[in-house]
Amino acid sequence: MKKTLSTLILAITSAVSINAQADDLLSVYQQALLNDTIVLKAQAQFSIDKEDIEQARSVLLPQISATASYSDGEQESYSSLTDSTSTAEFNSLGYGASLNMQLYHHDSWLRLDIAKKSAHQSDLTYQVAKQDLIVRVTEAYFTLLSAKDDLVFAQAEKAAIARQLEQTKQRFSVGLTAITDVHEAQAQYDNAVTEEIRSANAIFTAEEALRVITNVYPRNISALNTDRFSTTTPTPNSADAWQKTAEAKNLDLITAKVGIDVAQQTINSARAGHYPTLDFGASYNSSDGETDSDNPLLTSNDPRLNDYSIGVTLNVPIYSGGAIQSSVRQAQSNFVLASQDLMQTHRDVVRTTRNAYNTVVATISGIKAFEQSVLSAEKALEATEAGFEVGTRTIVDVLDSTRNLYDAKRNLSSTRYAYIQNVLSLKRSGGTITDEDITAINSGLVTAQ
């Protein structure tokens, strides 16, 4: 078992990334911007929707086309009167051009507006994906740091219990303690070994989670500088104020509002199917032909034909089998759907924003409590070990105090990371999160040794 554990820990400490990667949060985020599939898909969708604008605009512009044709042939004919065969050769050349343009198609202008609004909505979705990436990268990064901290604490706890186990065995050998104390210490040591294995595996899991986002394995990531770490009450300092900020700036909410505009214009576009349309058209066609025959009864000729036309076409829809009315009803139902989506998004934004604010405030208090808990646990362990030396405390008391100390350290470590994550979640809900937040957090890291 010791050999297996050593192999696992060695793999953790000596693993190298498949691709070279910088080891701080900012570099990991930049790598994620280039490789995260969610962001790249949102970017691609935005590019797709932008082209809809060009396609919708194109039908409003003149449509010009040109044609050309050439044919060459030969015809043989037999005359029973003259008992002779004659041959006629002919060829023709034709070309033309046409210009068509919509003078009035109300639905075409509405479709252009819908395309613009849809592209704007897609752009907002892309921005949302990038905001979410900040949160996801930071969460994955600090989950990995937390796993590494847990391994350090597990190894330190195991080492402390190993010393206590050895001390208990020595005391038992000279008759100063009972065999039950040895068993208690051995059981705690075995638990510590199990926790070390679990912590080591958690690092592998966290590395894989980060790799999914960045497409490279992390290596020697920078740690949180606990000496410089400090907490700050969110500004503004009330849940109501953050709710107002979110209602004005949250991109999910803004996206849903644009969806309402798109749905309304879709109704107008469907109704435009009842409107008349007016089109302009102009065309020119020319053809030249030549016929040459050896039959004296047939004359060779060189016909030329030119054709010009220009005009407007008015189309007034009278009855389309109910298709237009159906399209209007469908668009109206889609508007109801978009309205409900906006309402649900607003409720979710209010809930997540207020919860995020309260969570940040609670986490700040939690950090202060865990800092005091670590100090108290350290003093308690010292006192318990001193009592054990003089016989007033048992090895069970020492083991419990040891476990309490490292539990407090784990809780403090994880709560610090949770504070950073909760602040980002609050800013994400409030619509104020930016790349600068990554830079600010990165400045609070220290290069891994």
Regions found by a protein language model. Name each.
Residues 132-247, 359, 363, 404-405, ...:
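Periplasmic alpha-helical coiled-coil/stalk elements that build and connect Gram-negative outer-membrane
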Residues 67-101, 227-235, 268, 281-316, ...:
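Small/polar, glycine/serine/threonine/aspartate-rich low-complexity segments that form flexible
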Residues 411-449:
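Acidic, low-complexity, intrinsically disordered peripheral segments
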Residues 30-38, 47-62, 96-114, 124-131, ...:
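A glycine-/polar-enriched beta->alpha junction
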